[in-house]
Each structure stands twice: as structure tokens, then as C-alpha cells.
């Protein structure tokens, strides 16, 4: 085991704080409508330009092990917020930095870190309650477009595209973002279905950079039982290989010899194949397999129907123009099913929704209906160069996640104003002075996103924040894009509550851990042994006797 270096107390916290600052300072320049770009050097290909906080955070790795620990903890804040809300990563990073900074000062002044943490938790709980109470529900397509525009750094067209996509496939529909072959960004709605099962083995992946398995013009084998014996599958596999088309297997499970053989064939390049588990459980699994069969024009291979795997022919397999499989989801696009069959199935599910008395069953049936009838909206991102397309795609991903979050929990005034207002409304008291100090840390930290947005726009943060707080109306704030004050919601500057809430909760959670850290352990850097000295040269002028 390698020797470790241990740092305690103040020296540990100082190192950690330096790491937090390096990462947060790189991320926070991207905040707001006038946020700046960050250029990231790639080991291959052109550098990447982005305004996406989590993309910047993920690239940062520091040489000093202790500083790196601090940076990685804050990177965790950005990733967690991104996973849950899909946006707000920069806000979360700014909040985490502010709480850690203030907290470290308080600990250095001799306060109890655990009491500070309790105070922080009390304040955060009150702010979250206040945010949820202030939330305004989203009803119109225009409001959806406004949320999308803000998250895309003020690009109106992106907001409009997302609003249109949501209108076409419904709020629960599936919307994917792809790179276009042209310079224009366009929206396309494709009939399709997505379910929450990913590939059974990472060896099925065709795009290692994104960890996605893409199958074009694929056959689909639907089997309701487990597949473990390869022998029964051989006839259908051989028939598919003859066609040169890829095959997707959807079964209860694929294991043992069957899975191993499929993987080996995929790696050798003889067979383009992927396998996923069937979605759902029990009777619902049968129904969902039947849905997929109707969508793709295939047949579910089921012993109940007297169909054996050995006797399966190509015409029993479903067909789809494209299948995309990630670690968690499978999307089937443009199935070869008959329109009349799909409409019949939709009508049948609608009738079941009418009849059912269970809320849970109704919800699951509506999910199936959305998958069959809603389809998949694809936003194809265009641009003059590859770098521009990637940067735009990042922003559209953020905007899409933000709009979904807004539809779920509602919206509040944007531009950091909601948190600014909540900072004044914190009334909770701790059990002692140290807990009160924790509450005050949150009170001050809540101003940091608004201040950062104003600073990035080149204005004086203290003056702007003072002016906003002078007015006692919730929606009054500062538009950093135009430099005007006014009603934020009327100006279309709004944030989804889910994004703001998640950013604060994740930031406070990680910042509290950093404040309560008293020791840090890291491996000592390896010292390379010095090279062997060169041999002595021959000594001239000395003849042998």
C-alpha cells in the first residue's frame, strides 16, 4: 500500500477551498445572459467551446491531490443538479462556493461545524418551502418558450422549437436532440416509442463516445421468456445475417451462453446486434411487448400462442428504421407497423383508461398511450462548424431539461431574483448562536447567483442587488440582457422552481460536508528514483606494466 499524506484542520480546509475556488471561478463566468464562453482543449479534434456549467466542471482535474478533492466535491454538485433537474449547474456551483467560503470563515473563527451545518439545513428547508409556495404553474406554449429561451442563454428560436416539440408530442412525450447535417436547426416529429430498459452488455455499443448503440433499419425479435440457450436462436440469427441488417432482441432476459455468443459475434463484426430486457413486469410486460409488436409490425414469440423460437421466420420479426439504445433507455423510431393496427391499439388503451378504477393502472396506461400515439420529436441542431453545433447542442439540452422541470413544478422570477427575495424572508432561528450563524451563511449565499449574473454583464452587483431589494414586489428584478429593471415574469425572465430548488439543496448538501471536514488523506506523489550515474571513462596515458 502506498504511503499517504494526511492534512488536518485549517491547512486541510485551505487546500480544499483553493480547489473549490478554481473550479467555481471557471464555471461561474458562464452564468447569465451575458455569461462568457469557456474553451476546453480536447486530446483529439478541435477545442470545445461551451457555456454549460457541468461540461466545464467535468473537465477540471487539479495536480494537487488535496485541492483536487475540493474541486471534485463541487463537481459532484454540478453533476447531481444536472442529473435531477438537467439545468442550474452553474447556479448550484456558485451557491456551493459561497456557502463553503462563508462556512470556512466561521469555522476558522472557532464556531462548531456541526451546528453550522444544522443552521444551513434549517435555512435551506425554509427557502425551499418559500420557493414552492411562490411557484406559478405553466399553462401556455408561450411560457414554455420563455423558459427554453432563458436556459438557452437568450436564443429565442431554441425556446420556440422546444415549445413546438412539446406541443406536438405532449409534455410527457420523448424529445431527443441530434446534430444536423445542414447549417439550419430544424424540428422533426417521428412516430416512435421509448421504454426504460438499456443494453444488457456495454459491448453492444456502436458509439463509444456517447455510450450508445445505434441500429439502422433493424429487425426486432420479441420474446416473452428468458433466452439462455443459443441453439434455439440459431435459425433466426442465420436468417438475419443473410440480410446484412442489424437485430435487436427484446426478451425477459438474455443470459449465459446466449449473451456471451451474441457479444462475441458483435465484437468479431459478423452480426450487428443488441439485446435489451423487456419493459414492465408480469401482465404489463406482455401488454408492452404487444404494443412494440404492433408498432413494428412483428409478432411476440410466446409459448402460449404455440410459437417456438426454433420455428421463427423473418416475417415474424418487427422492423424499425432506427433503434437507439443507451444504458437506461431504448428508443424505437419509425416502426413498420400498419397505421390501422396502431390506431386500433390506441383506441383499446383509451377504453381501458376509461374503465380502470386504479390511479396507478391509469397512469401506466396513459404512459403506454403516450408512447404509442405521441411519437418522438427530434431537434436537429445545425451550425456553420462542428464546434458551433456542439456548443448549441449543449444549450438546447439544458433548455429542454429546464422546460420539462418548469412544467413539473412551475416557475419563479429568474435572474437570481427568487433566491434574493427568499434571503430576506428567512425567519427561522437556530438553537444556539452557531446555528444562527449557519442560517446567516445561507442568507448571504442566496445573493451570490444574482450578483454573479450582474457582474458577468459588466455592472455593479451591490448597486443592482440593493435596488432590487428596495422594491418589495416578488417579480421585480434586473434584466442583465438589456440593463433594465422591471417585472421579471412579464419580461420572460423565469426559472423553473425545480432547477432553483435542486441547485440550492445540492449545493448546501455538499458545502455542509466540506465545512465539517477535519482531516484529508491523499497518496503521496511518487518520487522517481534518480538515474544510475554513468560509468567511468577509460584513463588514458597509463600503460600496463
UniProtKB/Swiss-Prot annotation:
Single Gene Ontology MF annotation: unfolded protein binding
Xref: PROSITE patterns: CHAPERONINS_CPN60
GO term, biological process aspect, one: protein refolding
Entry's localization field: Cytoplasm
UniProt main location, coarse: cytoplasm
Keyword tags: ATP-binding, Chaperone, Cytoplasm, Isomerase, Nucleotide-binding, Stress response
The keyword ATP-binding appears for this protein: yes
Residues given in the record as ATP binding sites: 30-33, 51, 87-91, 415, 495
Catalytic activity entry: ATP + H2O + a folded polypeptide = ADP + phosphate + an unfolded polypeptide
Description of what induces expression: By heat shock.
EC number: 5.6.1.7
InterPro entries reported in the protein's UniProt record: Chaperonin_Cpn60_CS, Cpn60/GroEL, Cpn60/GroEL/TCP-1, GroEL-like_apical_dom_sf, GROEL-like_equatorial_sf, TCP-1-like_intermed_sf
Gene Ontology CC: one annotated term: cytoplasm
Cystines in this chain: none
Enzyme class: isomerase
Similarity comment: family membership: Belongs to the chaperonin (HSP60) family.
Subunit structure: Forms a cylinder of 14 subunits composed of two heptameric rings stacked back-to-back. Interacts with the co-chaperonin GroES.
Function comment: Together with its co-chaperonin GroES, plays an essential role in assisting protein folding. The GroEL-GroES system forms a nano-cage that allows encapsulation of the non-native substrate proteins and provides a physical environment optimized to promote and accelerate protein folding.
Name of the protein: Chaperonin GroEL 1
Organism taxonomic ancestry: Bacteria, Pseudomonadati, Pseudomonadota, Alphaproteobacteria, Hyphomicrobiales
Amino acid at each position: 500500500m502506498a504511503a499517504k499524506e494526511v492534512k488536518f484542520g485549517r491547512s486541510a480546509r485551505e487546500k480544499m477551498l483553493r480547489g473549490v475556488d478554481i473550479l467555481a471561478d471557471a464555471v461561474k463566468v458562464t452564468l447569465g445572459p451575458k455569461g462568457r464562453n469557456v474553451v476546453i482543449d480536447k486530446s483529439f479534434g478541435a477545442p470545445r467551446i461551451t457555456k454549460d456549467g457541468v461540461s466545464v466542471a467535468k473537465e477540471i482535474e487539479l495536480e494537487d491531490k488535496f485541492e483536487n478533492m475540493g474541486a471534485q466535491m463541487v463537481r459532484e454538485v454540478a453533476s447531481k443538479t444536472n442529473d435531477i433537474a438537467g439545468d442550474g449547474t452553474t447556479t448550484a456551483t456558485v451557491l456551493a462556493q459561497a456557502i463553503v467560503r462563508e462556512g470556512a470563515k466561521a469555522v476558522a473563527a472557532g464556531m462548531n461545524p456541526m451546528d453550522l451545518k444544522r443552521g444551513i439545513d434549517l435555512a435551506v428547508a425554509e427557502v425551499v418551502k418559500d420557493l414552492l409556495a411562490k411557484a406559478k404553474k405553466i399553462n401556455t406554449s408561450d411560457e414554455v418558450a420563455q423558459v427554453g429561451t432563458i436556459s438557452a442563454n437568450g436564443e429565442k428560436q431554441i425556446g420556440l422549437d422546444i415549445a413546438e416539440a412539446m406541443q406536438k408530442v405532449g409534455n410527457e412525450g420523448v424529445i431527443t436532440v441530434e446534430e444536423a447535417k445542414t447549417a439550419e436547426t430544424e424540428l422533426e416529429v417521428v412516430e416512435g416509442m421509448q421504454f426504460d430498459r438499456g443494453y444488457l452488455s456495454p459491448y453492444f455499443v456502436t458509439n463509444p463516445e456517447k455510450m450508445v448503440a445505434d441500429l439502422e433499419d433493424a429487425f426486432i425479435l420479441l420474446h416473452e421468456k428468458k433466452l439462455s440457450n443459443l441453439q434455439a436462436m440459431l435459425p433466426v440469427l442465420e436468417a438475419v445475417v443473410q440480410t446484412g441488417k442489424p437485430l435487436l432482441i427484446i426478451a425477459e432476459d438474455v443470459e449465459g451462453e446466449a449473451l456471451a455468443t451474441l457479444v462475441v459475434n458483435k465484437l468479431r463484426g459478423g452480426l450487428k446486434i443488441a439485446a435489451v430486457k423487456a419493459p414492465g413486469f408480469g401482465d404489463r410486460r406482455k401488454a408492452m411487448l404487444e404494443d412494440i409488436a404492433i408498432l413494428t409490425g412483428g409478432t411476440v414469440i410466446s409459448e402460449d400462442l404455440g410459437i417456438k423460437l426454433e420455428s421463427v421466420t423473418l416475417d415474424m420479426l418487427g422492423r424499425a428504421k432506427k433503434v437507439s439504445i443507451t444504458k437506461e433507455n431504448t428508443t424505437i423510431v419509425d416502426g413498420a407497423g400498419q397505421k390501422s393496427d396502431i390506431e386500433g391499439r390506441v383506441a383499446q388503451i383509451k377504453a381501458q383508461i376509461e374503465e380502470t378504477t386504479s390511479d396507478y393502472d391509469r397512469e401506466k396506461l396513459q404512459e403506454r398511450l403516450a408512447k404509442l400515439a405521441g411519437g418522438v420529436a427530434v431537434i436537429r441542431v445545425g451550425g456553420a462548424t462542428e464546434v458551433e453545433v456542439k456548443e448549441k447542442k449543449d444549450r438546447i439540452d439544458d433548455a429542454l431539461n429546464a422546460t420539462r422541470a418548469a412544467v413539473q413544478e412551475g416557475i419563479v422570477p429568474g435572474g437570481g431574483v427568487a433566491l434574493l427575495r427568499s434571503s430576506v424572508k428567512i425567519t427561522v432561528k437556530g438553537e444556539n448562536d452557531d446555528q444562527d450563524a449557519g442560517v446567516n451563511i445561507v442568507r448571504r449565499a442566496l445573493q451570490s447567483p444574482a450578483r454573479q449574473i450582474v457582474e458577468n454583464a459588466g455592472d455593479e452587483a451591490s448597486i443592482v442587488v440593493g435596488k432590487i431589494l428596495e422594491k418589495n414586489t416578488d417579480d421585480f428584478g434586473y434584466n442583465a440582457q438589456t440593463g433594465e429593471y422591471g417585472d421579471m415574469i412579464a419580461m420572460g425572465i423565469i426559472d423553473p422552481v425545480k432547477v432553483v430548488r435542486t441547485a440550492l439543496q445540492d449545493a448546501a448538501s455538499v458545502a455542509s460536508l466540506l465545512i465539517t471536514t477535519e482531516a484529508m488523506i491523499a497518496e503521496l506523489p511518487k518520487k522517481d528514483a534518480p538515474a544510475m550515474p554513468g560509468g567511468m571513462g577509460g584513463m588514458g596515458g597509463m600503460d600496463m606494466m
